[in-house]
């Protein structure tokens, strides 16, 4: 009967070769007996549920910062809509403020990163029920917009036409809106939804996620565990780094004589004298007290910094942003890292924000009660402010340079004083962007040419 053992050993070797992890059978790393095997072999039990994600966001500051960092930084200065007409731009800005567009978009993007899916539900007044596609020709107004997450938005029907560019995507959703003690469930067409996702999953994984993305916390979860464990262990080491030792003559004889109460009273008296008199009262002949260093903490800070760097590498967020300051002893973060981070944010603005915000803005523009009365300006576009924040000195220097340029343009006839005034001093504040109404310019030129021709003919 012992014959099958070689067969079992062969199977074990094959399984060891196929395990999706780093394995060292000599040290035990990655094996069932290794101390770090959990950190190397992710399995189905380690997948974060939506409840896990919510708890991490609510009760773990680092997890919340991972989810918040990109949306908050990308939209901290809001966004503007450029049309070439300062008055129209101010009206659009006021309409978007009334919708609370910047805050709603920030939340929806945050929920997308936290849960793998978030969305804006648009209150489009076109006279149709929400389960019907939006009829752009009938839009009276964009009444409101609310942010929801994937738990509130469940795909009901899917696009099954393989010739459609939306093949395999949700066509309608079941939306559950929670409010107070009641909830409301409605069916909503995808044209009334603006989706935000987290990490892009594989095609098969997306099917399991019901068409949504993956939480950004999923990939960083093991690193977060390791970092939290390291900080907790460091706290224990600090508490145990120095231990007080009290030597009492004939202690073993006292214990053998069943005088525990005497020993307890002595220790209590020692603590009281240390707290009240800030000194120790000892028997000069039979007692002594000293503090003993139980271990050095050299190198602990470096190890903890490396764990923070690993979490930073996993999330793509610089340590300066993730932890609020650079790790001690490391030159891993600085201005170059912040610049690279801002470049990443700028790319995310283009990838995640621009098309979604442009859709919201366009629906507001073509609505009959919107800021432009239903007339969509030609050539309008969404613009984002610089991520770099100027100091007061830099701001004053910029304004001085812009004023010099404006004076030159006015002197040469390139701009009019009215155009400069409307461009610089807007309702939302000072702006370095210059807007010129080219249509008005052409109309004025044509009128001047017609007047000149009439004068010459007369």
Regions found by a protein language model. Give the residues of each.
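N-terminal-proximal low-complexity accessory segments that begin disordered
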Residues: 1-75
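Activation/maturation switch segments at domain boundaries
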Residues: 287-289, 296, 339, 395-458
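Short, hydrophobic/amphipathic alpha-helical patches that form generic packing surfaces
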Residues: 61-76, 109-119, 218-243, 313, ...
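Extended, charged amphipathic alpha-helical segments
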Residues: 190-333, 337, 389-393
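C-terminal amphipathic alpha-helical
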Residues: 101-121, 255-258, 263-267, 293-399, ...
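Surface-exposed polar/charged interaction patches
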Residues: 14-25, 29-32, 53, 69-76, ...
């Amino acid at each position: 009967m012992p014959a099958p053992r070689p067969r079992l050993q062969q199977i074990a070797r094959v399984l060891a070769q196929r395990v999706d992890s780093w394995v060292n059978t000599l040290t035990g790393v990655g094996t069932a007996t290794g101390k770090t095997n959990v950190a190397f072999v992710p399995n189905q039990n380690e997948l974060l549920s939506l409840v896990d994600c919510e708890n991490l966001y609510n009760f773990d500051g680092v997890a919340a910062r991972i989810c918040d960092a990109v949306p908050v930084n990308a939209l901290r200065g809001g966004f503007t809509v450029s049309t070439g007409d300062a008055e129209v731009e101010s009206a659009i800005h006021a309409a978007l403020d009334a919708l609370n567009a910047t805050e709603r978009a920030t939340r929806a993007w945050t929920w997308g990163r936290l849960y793998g899916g978030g969305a804006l539900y648009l209150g489009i007044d076109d006279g149709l029920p929400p389960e019907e596609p939006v009829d752009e020709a009938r839009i009276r107004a964009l009444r409101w917009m609310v942010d929801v997450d994937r738990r509130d938005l469940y795909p009901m029907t899917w696009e099954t036409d393989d010739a459609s560019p939306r093949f395999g995507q949700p066509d309608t959703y079941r939306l559950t809106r929670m409010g107070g003690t009641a909830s409301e469930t409605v069916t909503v067409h995808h044209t009334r939804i603006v989706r935000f996702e987290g990490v892009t999953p594989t095609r098969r994984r997306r099917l399991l996620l019901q068409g949504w993305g993956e939480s950004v916390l999923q990939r960083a979860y093991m690193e977060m565990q390791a970092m939290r464990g390291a900080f907790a262990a460091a706290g224990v080491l600090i508490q145990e780094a120095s231990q007080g030792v009290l030597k009492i003559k004939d202690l073993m004889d006292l214990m053998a004589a069943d005088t525990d109460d005497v020993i307890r009273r002595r220790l209590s008296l020692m603590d009281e004298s240390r707290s009240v008199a800030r000194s120790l009262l000892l028997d000069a002949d039979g007692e002594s007290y000293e503090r003993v260093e139980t271990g050095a903490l050299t190198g602990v800070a470096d190890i903890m910094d490396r764990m923070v760097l690993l979490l930073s590498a996993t999330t793509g967020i610089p340590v300066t942003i993730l932890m609020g300051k650079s790790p001690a002893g490391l030159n891993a973060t600085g201005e170059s890292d912040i610049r690279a981070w801002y470049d990443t944010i700028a790319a995310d603005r283009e990838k995640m924000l621009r098309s979604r915000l442009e859709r919201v803005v366009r629906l507001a523009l073509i609505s009959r009660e919107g800021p432009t009365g239903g007339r969509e300006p030609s050539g309008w576009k969404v613009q984002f402010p610089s991520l770099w924040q100027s100091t007061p000195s830099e701001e004053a220097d910029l304004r001085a340079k812009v004023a010099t340029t404006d004076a030159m343009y006015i002197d040469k006839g390139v701009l009019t004083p009215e155009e400069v005034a409307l461009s610089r001093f807007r309702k939302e504040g000072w702006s370095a962007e210059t807007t010129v109404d080219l249509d008005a310019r052409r109309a004025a030129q044509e009128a001047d040419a017609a007047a000149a021709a009439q004068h010459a003919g007369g």
